[in-house]
């Protein structure tokens, strides 16, 4: 029965997405769950697969998120009407009783919490969030999806005829490496796209186009990253996004902090995936040289 219900939910998602007039009706009691993971943008992208997985087990799921991240999340799940959000303040602290009370008062059937248990260890990021819930690692790969937004297509169309690279060097800990080091290694006719900052002077040929590509939502850069000749990123939300994208080229680099205890470049060796549907790429370590 449970698998039949899941198949129905998946068919409903497809029908909703294509706006089909053929709507199958089911007579079972509707269920809903609330999901709480870590609340950074990168954490939400990491947990995209588990959220979409649980959205096939329940008729609707609600994801805890900070107010400042709501817009990004709405875009991550724009294609699925069964996924909604409960906003909390930036200083939110997980208190089990409060979450359980909220769930009970709002008639949720289940509370799904990952990453808020005191004894949790995070050596196996990002897969530990799935292990905490006893989910197989392939849920991370196979259920991940962020739709291609019109804005993503618009931004990519504006630079698709340029020779360009994508660089993101900032995370919650600040600036991780100097973009100027990359400028020294590339042809002057190569456009450097950074989502947070325009590195060109106002009289430079690339200033205007680089300016139009700054400060957009994370999902808006999907096609730009997928088609970049070179990607160079630090351990940030953009890296969390990029490892599950269909990158066109092989030169994709990750800057690893010196005290990091988890080598993300070996993810694909330890946690294999089926690459027949999405051509994911391995990452190389960036050591100020591309």
Outline where the language-model segments fall.
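Anionic, Ser/Thr-rich low-complexity intrinsically disordered regions
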Residues: 1-30
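Catalytic machinery of carbohydrate-active enzymes
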Residues: 31-290
